[in-house]
Swiss-Prot record:
Optimum pH is 8.0. Beta-D-fructose 1,6-bisphosphate binds at H22, Y94, G107, N108, K136, Q250, S251, R274, D295, Y357. The gene is fbp. Keywords: Carbohydrate metabolism, Gluconeogenesis, Hydrolase, Lyase, Magnesium, Metal-binding, Schiff base. Consists of a single catalytic domain, but remodels its active-site architecture via a large structural change to exhibit dual activities. Mg(2+) 4 binds at D241. Its EC number is 3.1.3.11, 4.1.2.13. Mg(2+) 1 binds at D15, H22, D56, Q98. The lineage of its organism: Archaea, Methanobacteriati, Methanobacteriota, Thermococci, Thermococcales. Belongs to the FBP aldolase/phosphatase family. The active site is at D15, Y237, K240. This is Fructose-1,6-bisphosphate aldolase/phosphatase. Dihydroxyacetone phosphate binds at H22, K136, R274, D295. InterPro entries: FBPase_V, FBPase_V_sf. GO terms for biological process: gluconeogenesis.
Amino acid sequence: MAIGEKITISVIKADIGGWPGHSRVHPQLIEAAEEVLAKAKEEGTIIDFYVAYAGDDLQLIMTHKKGVDSPDIHGLAWKAFEEATEIAKEFGLYGAGQDLLKDAFSGNIRGMGPGIAEMEITLRKSEPIVTFHMDKTEPGAFNLPIFRMFADPFNTAGLVIDPNMHMGFRFEVWDIKEHKRVILNTPEEIYDLLALIGAKSRYVIKRVYPKEGHKISKDEPVAVISTEKLYEIAGEYVGKDDPVAIVRAQSGLPALGEVLEPFAFPHLVSGWMRGSHNGPIMPVPMHQANPTRFDGPPRVVALGWQISPEGKLVGPVDLFDDPAFDYARQKALEITEYIRRHGPFEPHRLPLEDMEYTTLPGVLKKLEERFEDIE
């Protein structure tokens, strides 16, 4: 392949067993997935791959020519997760296979448990991308940083001074409860956009597109986020959604530093212990993506890549492995210490409507007959 041709980048993740508890991925699970993907690369199914982890989530990063939602690619990811799950079961790892919510692959991995972010793009002369991997949180955790990357001039100077970005971007927002979507233009609809995405447990940014007149086609995404909600698939709490994202950078898009800048502020996200608490998202290098304190605080890893003209993944560069993010980490720990002192009280604990898949409904049912009217 060559510059100007179509290539697909797929990031597919699943929690298939923690070591120990919910803290990290066992190295042999990574090796098992690597073996499956290496064989697929030899056979020409994929161009290149890398297996990463964030907390207890196994992360598959692949390039290929098969487009988004390819049964071949999704089936390959499912096979990698199944092979790793067998080892997880052999070792007795915690929650072995917990994100594989169906017994057999049926052509598309969506709705089966794993989280997916994919984009088919026209390869530029230089194609820098960042893959983000979060643990112990939900898809809405990306709302604030993605907004800042592509719509906040206080974060992204290019929106003001780069003529190729000055027209702004289009945001595809999903209502994940009503299963509807809307596309909003920035900067002209910025307040409408914020009205929605501020409610991060319901309205999530799914994709960002250029506008008409940009050097990149307006139908080609420049950012994509996984939006799978595990509880909607399983019907019960089986773990937080732990989203992933792919963001393109440079040359009419946010520069690499503008893509990373939002994470200098450890904003509050939902998830953490038992998926039922608010806490700060802490930017960390991959080797520190091992949530321990109260199963947290929630983590985000940023891996930087260049896509070669042949579609190879040149990288990764562990972008948060940098003292420039030490202050954000320290601030996240201060917020952690403060908010943990609330114990089982809101706003540390999530509001009632987000506690549906915990013991709380059972407690209310048990006490139902003891409630009396107040005169």
